[in-house]
Protein backbone atom coordinates (compact mmCIF):
# COMPACT_ATOMS: atom_id res chain seq x y z
CA UNK A 1 0.00 0.00 0.00
CA UNK A 2 1.36 3.38 -1.05
CA UNK A 3 0.75 6.55 0.91
CA UNK A 4 -1.29 9.11 -1.09
CA UNK A 5 0.33 9.85 -4.44
CA UNK A 6 -2.25 12.29 -5.83
CA UNK A 7 -0.74 15.68 -6.61
CA UNK A 8 -0.74 17.55 -3.29
CA UNK A 9 0.36 20.83 -1.73
CA UNK A 10 3.84 20.41 -0.18
CA UNK A 11 3.53 23.79 1.58
CA UNK A 12 0.49 22.64 3.59
CA UNK A 13 2.42 22.37 6.87
CA UNK A 14 2.95 24.62 9.91
CA UNK A 15 5.98 26.79 10.68
CA UNK A 16 7.47 26.66 7.19
CA UNK A 17 7.87 22.88 7.26
CA UNK A 18 7.29 20.71 4.20
CA UNK A 19 4.32 18.37 3.86
CA UNK A 20 5.46 15.07 2.37
CA UNK A 21 2.63 12.81 3.59
CA UNK A 22 0.29 13.61 0.71
CA UNK A 23 -2.94 13.99 2.69
CA UNK A 24 -3.75 17.41 1.19
CA UNK A 25 -4.76 16.60 -2.40
CA UNK A 26 -5.02 19.10 -5.22
CA UNK A 27 -5.86 16.76 -8.09
CA UNK A 28 -7.30 13.24 -7.92
CA UNK A 29 -5.99 12.21 -11.36
CA UNK A 30 -2.30 13.13 -11.36
CA UNK A 31 0.70 11.52 -9.64
CA UNK A 32 2.58 13.95 -7.41
CA UNK A 33 5.41 15.48 -9.45
CA UNK A 34 8.06 15.14 -6.72
CA UNK A 35 7.64 11.36 -6.63
CA UNK A 36 8.64 10.92 -10.26
CA UNK A 37 11.77 11.73 -12.24
CA UNK A 38 10.40 13.49 -15.33
CA UNK A 39 9.16 17.03 -15.87
CA UNK A 40 6.69 15.89 -18.53
CA UNK A 41 3.25 14.97 -17.17
CA UNK A 42 2.84 12.21 -19.76
CA UNK A 43 6.26 10.72 -18.99
CA UNK A 44 5.36 10.77 -15.30
CA UNK A 45 2.22 8.79 -16.05
CA UNK A 46 4.27 6.28 -18.06
CA UNK A 47 6.74 5.99 -15.20
CA UNK A 48 4.02 5.19 -12.69
CA UNK A 49 2.50 2.62 -15.06
CA UNK A 50 5.92 0.98 -15.29
CA UNK A 51 6.18 0.88 -11.48
CA UNK A 52 2.86 -0.96 -11.26
CA UNK A 53 3.89 -3.36 -14.03
CA UNK A 54 7.16 -4.20 -12.25
CA UNK A 55 5.32 -4.77 -8.97
CA UNK A 56 2.94 -7.16 -10.73
CA UNK A 57 5.88 -9.07 -12.24
CA UNK A 58 7.08 -9.64 -8.67
CA UNK A 59 3.56 -10.73 -7.58
CA UNK A 60 3.07 -7.53 -5.57
CA UNK A 61 -0.35 -5.90 -5.70
CA UNK A 62 -0.50 -2.10 -5.60
CA UNK A 63 -3.03 -0.47 -3.27
CA UNK A 64 -3.34 3.32 -3.28
CA UNK A 65 -4.21 5.30 -0.18
CA UNK A 66 -6.73 7.80 -1.59
CA UNK A 67 -8.06 11.02 -0.07
CA UNK A 68 -11.52 11.93 -1.36
CA UNK A 69 -12.88 13.35 1.92
CA UNK A 70 -11.26 16.82 1.64
CA UNK A 71 -8.85 18.93 -0.42
CA UNK A 72 -5.81 21.04 0.42
CA UNK A 73 -7.85 24.25 0.33
CA UNK A 74 -8.59 24.30 4.06
CA UNK A 75 -11.56 26.24 5.43
CA UNK A 76 -13.37 29.18 3.86
CA UNK A 77 -10.31 31.38 4.42
CA UNK A 78 -7.98 28.99 2.59
CA UNK A 79 -6.63 29.37 -0.94
CA UNK A 80 -8.62 28.52 -4.08
CA UNK A 81 -6.47 25.81 -5.65
CA UNK A 82 -8.86 23.27 -7.13
CA UNK A 83 -12.56 22.57 -6.47
CA UNK A 84 -13.09 25.70 -4.36
CA UNK A 85 -12.24 27.86 -7.35
CA UNK A 86 -14.63 25.95 -9.60
CA UNK A 87 -17.78 25.68 -7.46
CA UNK A 88 -17.34 25.54 -3.70
CA UNK A 89 -21.08 25.20 -3.08
CA UNK A 90 -21.15 22.00 -5.14
CA UNK A 91 -17.99 20.27 -3.94
CA UNK A 92 -18.05 21.11 -0.22
CA UNK A 93 -20.48 21.03 2.66
CA UNK A 94 -21.10 24.65 3.63
CA UNK A 95 -23.24 25.65 6.61
CA UNK A 96 -25.86 28.38 6.83
CA UNK A 97 -23.21 30.64 8.34
CA UNK A 98 -21.19 30.21 5.08
CA UNK A 99 -18.43 28.39 6.97
CA UNK A 100 -17.17 25.07 5.66
CA UNK A 101 -18.49 22.06 7.58
CA UNK A 102 -15.57 19.88 8.57
CA UNK A 103 -15.47 16.21 9.58
CA UNK A 104 -12.07 15.63 7.96
CA UNK A 105 -10.07 17.66 10.47
CA UNK A 106 -8.60 19.59 7.55
CA UNK A 107 -10.98 22.53 7.24
CA UNK A 108 -13.41 21.17 4.64
CA UNK A 109 -15.36 18.06 3.71
CA UNK A 110 -16.13 16.91 0.17
CA UNK A 111 -19.84 16.35 -0.56
CA UNK A 112 -19.21 12.92 -2.06
CA UNK A 113 -22.86 11.98 -2.59
CA UNK A 114 -23.81 14.85 -4.89
CA UNK A 115 -24.13 13.65 -8.48
CA UNK A 116 -21.26 15.48 -10.18
CA UNK A 117 -18.93 14.94 -7.23
CA UNK A 118 -19.69 11.20 -7.23
CA UNK A 119 -18.99 11.07 -10.93
CA UNK A 120 -15.61 12.76 -10.45
CA UNK A 121 -14.62 10.30 -7.71
CA UNK A 122 -15.71 7.32 -9.83
CA UNK A 123 -13.78 8.63 -12.85
CA UNK A 124 -10.69 9.04 -10.67
CA UNK A 125 -10.95 5.46 -9.37
CA UNK A 126 -11.45 4.17 -12.91
CA UNK A 127 -8.44 6.15 -14.13
CA UNK A 128 -6.09 4.66 -11.55
CA UNK A 129 -7.51 1.15 -11.99
CA UNK A 130 -7.81 1.03 -15.79
CA UNK A 131 -5.11 3.39 -16.99
CA UNK A 132 -2.48 2.72 -14.34
CA UNK A 133 -3.41 -0.85 -13.37
CA UNK A 134 -3.58 -0.49 -9.59
CA UNK A 135 -5.24 -3.34 -7.71
CA UNK A 136 -7.10 -1.52 -4.99
CA UNK A 137 -7.77 1.56 -2.93
CA UNK A 138 -7.72 2.41 0.76
CA UNK A 139 -10.10 5.28 1.59
CA UNK A 140 -8.71 7.78 4.09
CA UNK A 141 -11.53 8.63 6.56
CA UNK A 142 -13.77 6.58 4.28
CA UNK A 143 -16.91 6.90 6.39
CA UNK A 144 -16.89 10.65 5.68
CA UNK A 145 -17.91 9.69 2.13
CA UNK A 146 -21.18 8.34 3.54
CA UNK A 147 -22.39 11.75 4.70
CA UNK A 148 -25.29 13.49 3.02
CA UNK A 149 -26.67 17.00 3.33
CA UNK A 150 -26.06 18.67 6.70
CA UNK A 151 -23.44 15.94 7.23
CA UNK A 152 -26.18 13.41 8.04
CA UNK A 153 -24.92 9.80 7.71
CA UNK A 154 -26.66 7.92 4.89
CA UNK A 155 -27.62 4.25 5.28
CA UNK A 156 -27.07 3.61 1.56
CA UNK A 157 -24.65 6.25 0.29
CA UNK A 158 -24.92 6.67 -3.50
CA UNK A 159 -21.13 6.93 -3.85
CA UNK A 160 -20.65 3.36 -2.59
CA UNK A 161 -23.59 2.08 -4.64
CA UNK A 162 -21.99 3.62 -7.74
CA UNK A 163 -18.64 2.01 -6.93
CA UNK A 164 -20.29 -1.40 -6.48
CA UNK A 165 -22.14 -1.07 -9.81
CA UNK A 166 -19.19 0.17 -11.89
CA UNK A 167 -18.03 -2.62 -14.26
CA UNK A 168 -14.46 -1.28 -14.44
CA UNK A 169 -14.12 -1.58 -10.66
CA UNK A 170 -15.65 -5.03 -10.15
CA UNK A 171 -12.31 -6.78 -9.51
CA UNK A 172 -10.76 -3.96 -7.49
CA UNK A 173 -10.11 -4.28 -3.75
CA UNK A 174 -11.50 -1.60 -1.43
CA UNK A 175 -10.35 -0.91 2.12
CA UNK A 176 -11.54 1.93 4.34
CA UNK A 177 -11.03 3.71 7.60
CA UNK A 178 -14.55 3.40 9.09
CA UNK A 179 -14.28 6.66 11.03
CA UNK A 180 -14.03 10.40 10.50
CA UNK A 181 -13.23 13.41 12.66
CA UNK A 182 -16.90 14.15 13.25
CA UNK A 183 -17.35 11.15 15.53
CA UNK A 184 -18.89 8.75 13.00
CA UNK A 185 -17.54 5.23 13.58
CA UNK A 186 -18.85 2.25 11.60
CA UNK A 187 -16.50 -0.65 12.27
CA UNK A 188 -18.42 -3.81 11.35
CA UNK A 189 -21.26 -1.72 9.95
CA UNK A 190 -19.65 0.05 7.00
CA UNK A 191 -22.26 0.99 4.36
CA UNK A 192 -20.62 -0.87 1.47
CA UNK A 193 -20.75 -4.63 1.02
CA UNK A 194 -17.49 -4.84 -0.94
CA UNK A 195 -15.27 -2.72 1.34
CA UNK A 196 -12.96 -4.14 4.01
CA UNK A 197 -12.44 -1.91 7.04
CA UNK A 198 -9.51 -1.12 9.27
CA UNK A 199 -9.98 -2.08 12.90
CA UNK A 200 -8.87 1.03 14.75
CA UNK A 201 -9.22 -0.66 18.14
CA UNK A 202 -6.82 -3.41 17.12
Describe the residue ranges of each PLM region.
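Substrate-binding/active-site clefts of carbohydrate-active enzymes
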Residues: 3-133, 141-168, 184
Amino acid sequence: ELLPIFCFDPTDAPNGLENFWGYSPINWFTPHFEYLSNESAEKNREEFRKLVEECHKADIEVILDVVYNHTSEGDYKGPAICWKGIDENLYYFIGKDKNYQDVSGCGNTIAANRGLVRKLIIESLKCWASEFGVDGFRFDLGIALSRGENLSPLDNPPIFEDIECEPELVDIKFISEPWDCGGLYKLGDFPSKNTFTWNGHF
